[in-house]
């Protein structure tokens, strides 16, 4: 759509009909961009451009309220507060789908065999065609359109009667307020779209972060956060929660005989839903027979943790609508569909004890010892409690029934305690995801200390206390001001830290000691062959080859890798020391600024603060590390063992050619990698940022540059290609 010449800057005196045309043009443009962004997942303009047009429409409607239409993008966030949610009786019941109890892929074969049996198909009959789709972990929703306009949105409720949540659903940008006319089927007078309201994982994480910053309760999981938002009485609150929607079916619809669409298959219906502007999951596909259903179950299961949203299984539906009618229903469940779940990712179990683990940096982590429970596809017996403040916040004590979450490779964690009201059924439902669902608050937040305090407990179960001495080495445990975590002060003398410190020192991004893996480090530390980092370079062939499963050839390879690692760089060495808050980028900045290790070791906090991107917390951590005599001794011993690197003069930042300039890199450069370009710019005194702002001096853009380039053009920031950047570096 071409931009209307008067879209943003209207003449001082504009005719009423021109005002209406301008408002219509703005609405049409916003609808088109929203469709591209939310439905097609193919945005064509940066967010800032959308916001600019939105604000222009908003200003126009504010000045001329008579131009506001029900489908205007400005009307999504109404901000009205409802006195209560009104019951809604579904014209077509929102029935549940039978769940296949076999969570293995073979469950698909069971369903296919049942369908073939119900259809009385011969063994040699062609395979049945199905539609396979993800089973979204959200809140079922029914959207009613009359003459193409959204008039009502209702929750599933008990299947017969739900609740009117139209005021909140209108805030979801993926849901069209009006349907486009035209197309193969047109728009029927009555159309009910069934689907799922959900929250993307990234949006959920950002929401919880905002809750924490505001001192509010965090949410248990994306599903409960979405459900809590949908049932808010105040749509302004719902609008602040980033909800999304997928369509997957129809409810009440004008019959074909009265002008409604006459779909032959479920897949045809999904295609039309997309044509009407509804998002349909990209994973949806047709599948012929049991073998393709099994393949779909396995494929989606393997990528489940990489999806941007939660699913708890897949759904199979017979594709032919005629066969669906032939199969019919049994006990209010369709015979033509089944939900094939994956192992649950949240379950309930009992805390049998709380232990404390010590990590590489000395952080003490309380870990709940649990009654074994099968969750996320594995048997879980331990789950992290993070720190003392999380324990107090959640009110966890030994003997409590708790909700445990595990997703993919994420470490299992205790989400919260089971509220007192559910304790009578907790024993019966231990190991159940149903209880985990019920245990969250009505607004989707996690149960915490208040719920735990309400639970009847033995008065003899004390609150957990963090130990004052390290459980591994006996050193004093401290908690720095403003920090939630307790730490052991034993440093490299603590065996728990020693193992992790050795592995960190040896990793590819640090000293790159090939062959020095976890099992070998375990033997070296537990056998007391190594106590400090310099002991690595004192290892001999006899000591190494005498270890379990360490042949002489393998020992020689490790010794050769150790010898090779002696010739390193200052940034790698600094990173390998494992100083808190010092990652690869900070190590490079330190080396570039000071030139040599001695200058870094002797630097004051004030001098460290002069380094690019080093703030008070990082500066204090570096200064504290090198203030410890045993850490300085380790460094000197490593030097004495032959570890060496090339040092240079300290950088005078103010005299560097690009000092004070901020660059942003985007796209693929012809000859330089992103890291190479960054290194060259930083060596010339520039700061390389991750996002474009008014403080950005240059954007360096390569092929397939994204939104950063658009942002630069919008703000008027100069854009360079690789050649331009190199010329700038050479002072041309």
UniProtKB/Swiss-Prot annotation:
The positions flagged as active site in the entry are 135 (n6-amp-lysine intermediate)
| Keywords tagged on the record | DNA damage, DNA repair, DNA replication, Ligase, Magnesium, Manganese, Metal-binding, NAD, Zinc
Please name the Gene3D superfamilies in this protein's record: 5' to 3' exonuclease, C-terminal subdomain, 6.20.10.30, BRCT domain, DNA ligase/mRNA capping enzyme, Helix hairpin bin, Nucleic acid-binding proteins
Domain named BRCT is located at 653-732
Give the cofactors, semicolon-separated. Answer: Mg(2+); Mn(2+)
Annotated GO biological process: DNA repair; DNA replication
Q: What is this protein called?
A: DNA ligase
Sites where the protein binds NAD(+): 47-51, 96-97, 133, 156, 196, 317, 341
**Which HAMAP family does the record associate with it?**
DNA_ligase_A
Q: What function is annotated for this protein?
A: DNA ligase that catalyzes the formation of phosphodiester linkages between 5'-phosphoryl and 3'-hydroxyl groups in double-stranded DNA using NAD as a coenzyme and as the energy source for the reaction. It is essential for DNA replication and repair of damaged DNA.
The Gene Ontology terms for molecular function here are:
DNA binding; DNA ligase (NAD+) activity; metal ion binding
Q: Which gene encodes it?
A: ligA
